[in-house]
Structure formats: C-alpha cells, structure tokens
Amino acid sequence: FALAHMVNDFDIMKSYLDEGANGIETDITFSPEGEPESAFHGVPCDCKRWCDRTVSFDSYLQKTSDLSTPGHPDYRENLLIIILDLKLNGLSQDALANGGRRLADKLAAHFWTGGRRDQRATFVVSVPQTSQKVFMKTFREEMEAIGMGDMNAKVGFDFTDNGDVSVTKAVYDELGITEHIWASDGITNCVALLFRGTSRLEELIQKRDEGESTYISKVYAWTYDKETSVVLALELGVDGVMTNYADFVISILNKPEHSSKYRLATYEDDPFERFKAV
C-alpha cells in the first residue's frame, strides 16, 4: 500500500489519487465532548507540507464515500484504504467513549445506511495511545448496536504510539480484537530514520510472521520520503509505506529489483490478509 500522508482537503486528495496512491491518511479532530469535527492537522506538521488544510468531517466522509462507490461520477478505483488518524489527546475518558460511538454513527450514515453496501473503501481506526482504548471499545459496541456489525469487515484498528509490542497485544486481547489489526512504526519526516532506527519495525514484522498466534495483519512504516528509507522498508517486508510523495514510492516499487517481489495492492487484495516477508 502506498499511503498518502496528511490528506486533509479535497485538492490534496485529488493530487495524491492522481499520483496513484491506493490509501490515504487523514487527521480527524474532535470537540472536547468527543464529537468528530474536521480533517485538520495544524502546526507543527511534516517538513515541506502545508499544515492548515482542512474540511469538515461530514464533507470529508461524503467525498470519500463518492470516491469509493462504483458507478459514481467521482469514483476512483485506487482508493482502497482510509486511515483515520484520530486526534484524541487531551480528551477525557467520557469524551473518548462518546467519540467512539459518534465515529461509528458517522461512518454508518455516510457509507452503509439505507442498504448501501457497495462502497469499496476500508477504514483503519487509528488511536494515538493504548490508554485511549475505550474509544475502540465503544466504536465496536456502537457498530453492533446500530445494526452495522457486518460492516466491521471493512474496519481495522491501529495504535500509533510506537509503544511496547507486548503491551499493545494485551490491550487488543482485553478489547477482544483478534483480527484486522494494522501495526505501525515511524517518525516525522523532519527527523532522519537513522535516529529512529528500525528495531521496533522489525519486531512488528517478526510478530506478523509468527503464524496463527499473531495478532498483526499488516505492518506499515511512516513517514518515509527518502529512497533509502523506502527501499529499506521494502527489504524488511512491510505491507505499506506512508509518505508525502506517493508517486515516488510507487516508482521505487516498480523498479525491477522490487517489482519481482512486490506490487501495488488492488481491490482484489484483502487489506487484512496476512502475508509473510520473503
């Protein structure tokens, strides 16, 4: 997966999809009560990026619904995965719980109500810290409560705190989440990968490849903009690279030394199916 980073308005969304990105990551802000409000990152953000792009969350969901619906004039077949980077830090536990319910309500309203089941997008609900696990809990409960339990097939989960892998697994076990888990490791593009290292990324890949006992479906690295970093990630066996330059990552993927091993994912590929690094 070539995952376009910080896709917070429609102009940049079109640009990245034109480049060939098959996934987008969007920053979602919340009110103090836990209501999803807008796609917005703000400063600071990645180097060489405009931090203040924004649209309302409802507008964002309507647009991505149109883009992922076959037969719609705006349909883009390469939009496969939408990572919702949820800006939850500072919210109370009550607000987090409300936020999980409200996100489920809004996804259902824009994508799946009224018998609509043909949208092709898959979501990753990306929570900053394991201490905010109640958000995932209430999201899943609300999906069942509103009769959308079958649509959990289109939803995955991710914690982005670069935390201890065993602690993260314990939290997923507590929540009863045993599949559809995307695991990530990374750092802003303003800091060289040299300073971050890849030891945790390698640990995630190893855990993914352990067999039926593993809890990880996919592993992605962020935010990789340099060729050396992208090549290293591919050599390690990641499932996705989040980047500010989707066309650049795709061009590396298409080089002969990589295309024999990798290809860009399509709709026929299950975003939650586990593939081992070879």
Curated annotation (Swiss-Prot):
Organism for this UniProt entry: Loxosceles spinulosa
Taxonomy of the source species: Eukaryota, Metazoa, Ecdysozoa, Arthropoda, Chelicerata
UniProt binding sites for Mg(2+): 25, 27, 85
Name of the protein in question: Dermonecrotic toxin LspiSicTox-betaIE2ii
GO term, biological process aspect, one: lipid catabolic process
Keyword vocabulary terms for this entry: Cytolysis, Dermonecrotic toxin, Disulfide bond, Hemolysis, Lipid degradation, Lipid metabolism, Lyase, Magnesium, Metal-binding, Secreted, Toxin
Entries under InterPro entries matching the protein: PLC-like_Pdiesterase_TIM-brl
Tissue: Expressed by the venom gland.
Catalytic activity, EC: 4.6.1.-
GO cellular component, one term: extracellular region
Chief localization: secreted
Disulphide-bridged cysteine pairs: 45-51, 47-190
Active site: 5, 41
Family: Belongs to the arthropod phospholipase D family. Class II subfamily.
